[in-house]
Amino acid sequence: GSHAVQSNWSFYTMYRFNWDEQMVGISLGIIGLLVGLVQGVLIRWINPKIGNVKSIYIGLLLYTIGMFLFAFATESWMIFLFLIPYCLGGIAGPALQAVVSENVKPSEQGEIQGVLASLMSASAIIGPPMMAYVFYFFTHEDAPFKFPGAPFVLGGTLMLVSTVLAYRTLRKNHRK
């Protein structure tokens, strides 16, 4: 789902809000700053406080909310505001890795980390062209209707499905 942002941010903001390269660069800088704060500061504080499982649920929901907010933003200032829940969703990834590691024998850690890396690689191969095509489909001249936020709706939907799957799996299988 996050590939909706990674592969379409520049196209979306230029198309929807008529941003220029400087504005796109500023927004990407802010994303980098927010991600750095979440990854470098917030995770160390919040994940131990609420636990990894809740961090997964909350993080995935925040990603979902951020995606849907991006999709339906009507003003540039909204995009900057909506970066907050989206970037806060970054608490989910490290928590998910921690939960997976906690539930695997030490002798299987390398294998499970390899599986996780492979899944991330597969999504990095499939996600960008898929999301770019969705953007194209809803913005080209003969589109059935114009909706540049479509990749974010798809990304948000995928994040929501991930949240439900995580909840069902962790509720049934998590030992801690």
What are these regions (language model features)?
Residues 153-176:
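Multi-pass alpha-helical transporter architecture, strongest
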Residues 91-105:
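Intracellular juxtamembrane helix-capping segments at the cytosolic ends
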Residues 7-24:
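Short amphipathic helix-loop junctions that connect adjacent transmembrane helices
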Residues 38-52, 135:
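Helix-to-loop junctions at the C-terminal end of transmembrane segments
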Residues 133-159:
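A membrane-interface helix-boundary motif in multi-pass transporters
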Residues 21-22, 104-118, 145-148:
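Loop-to-transmembrane helix entry/capping segments in MFS-fold secondary transporters
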Residues 69-83, 92:
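Helix-loop junctions at membrane interfaces in 12-TM secondary transporters
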